[in-house]
From Swiss-Prot:
Pfam families per the UniProt record, alphabetical: His_biosynth
Subcellular localization, as worded in the UniProt entry: Cytoplasm
Name this protein carries in UniProt: 1-(5-phosphoribosyl)-5-[(5-phosphoribosylamino)methylideneamino] imidazole-4-carboxamide isomerase
Signal peptide: none
Protein source organism: Campylobacter concisus (strain 13826)
Amino acid sequence: MEIFPAIDLKEGQAVRLSKGLMQSAKIYSSEPSELAKRFEDYGAKWLHVVDLDGAFAGEAINFKTIEKIVKATNLKVQVGGGIRDEERIKRYLDLGVSRVILGSVALRDPEFTAKMAGIYRVVVGIDAKDGYVAVQGWGEVSNIKAVDLAKKFADVGVEAVICTDINKDGMLGGVNVDFSLQIARSSKLETIASGGVSDINDILALKATKEIAGVIVGKAYYEGRLDLKDAFKQVG
């Protein structure tokens, strides 16, 4: 199982939110590229980067900061937040990003998402509140169930699906293992769990399922609850 340290960007700074609320943003670093270097030193292979401003605005607000992060390390980087057209996908991949995360557009235009997955390295991000998909920076909840959306991308070339339980995100209250398993089993895709990781036990619980491909870690590290170096050693 892969651990993905997370860097969420707001106005060029690394922040964490609680339940996806922008007004809850807490700044952890004004030099996100230095954070990326630290994660690489700890043993990370992948980095999960989200342009929060982009998620709300629908455009690449923190592109320059992401460029700096990509150039600072040899980490593989997956990027999400406001990526809703082919031009932006190509722009990020040309920059050196390993793969892009499509979120809102996956719900609004699954045909486009499937087409892009057939051409480029695409991950689908499914963010859910009480089991239903949320979009537009989590500000809008649809009437589509997360498991039903995941099924749509089972055989179209999507590399993985990231499933986030919004109610858990940034709350340090434990990860929703059952939700992650529902997505993994319904889609048959590599599934990356996100939201609520509080310590090493949450990571080990996901690993123990043998059905979850990865986990995204943010606030648990930033708040000193998780020794990432040790986590990489334990997960292997």
